[in-house]
């Protein structure tokens, strides 16, 4: 009887190890990656992970931000409340598609400063695209009332983008990444829909 119990216990341990292994495998398989992968069927994504950093000094430059390890993970739908700090948002992207032109957009318009920073590997320097509620539409990277930025990622390469936000109002919003053609097609459809309703 003792050997029978020992045999059952041994089999039970093996089954338990097997179940735990399957559970861990499934967890890793569906884990939320912090890198947004852009593939050929990609048109837009509004559900991915970002990282953010609160700069209470309001004086950090892009070099210091890029080298910082103080970022906290968050979904791209964020609500950080009223702060006097500058908020830096980090978005990691990997381009596995045949496209190279993409657009990053914030759905909230009331940021005094909403600048996008990225490292241009061909010129070996940081570039800044300025935007914000007080930036005239004619001076924006994309002439739209949205806070939107046009950027390129070469095929089969990765890029980290930093968005610098400064506001007098609460920090909240949603960051989305679009393929360039989808962004402009949906924008035209929205404008046309408005005029159809007018006449």
Sequence positions of predicted segments:
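N-terminal secretory signal peptides that target proteins for export/translocation
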Residues: 1-14
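Intrinsically disordered, low-complexity segments
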Residues: 5-8, 19, 143
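Prokaryotic Sec-type signal peptides and long signal-anchor helices
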Residues: 6-7, 27-29, 75
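Bacterial N-terminal signal peptides
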Residues: 19-27
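Soluble non-transmembrane domains of integral membrane proteins
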Residues: 32-191
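Selective detector of the "anchor" transmembrane alpha-helix that sits immediately C-terminal
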Residues: 191-199
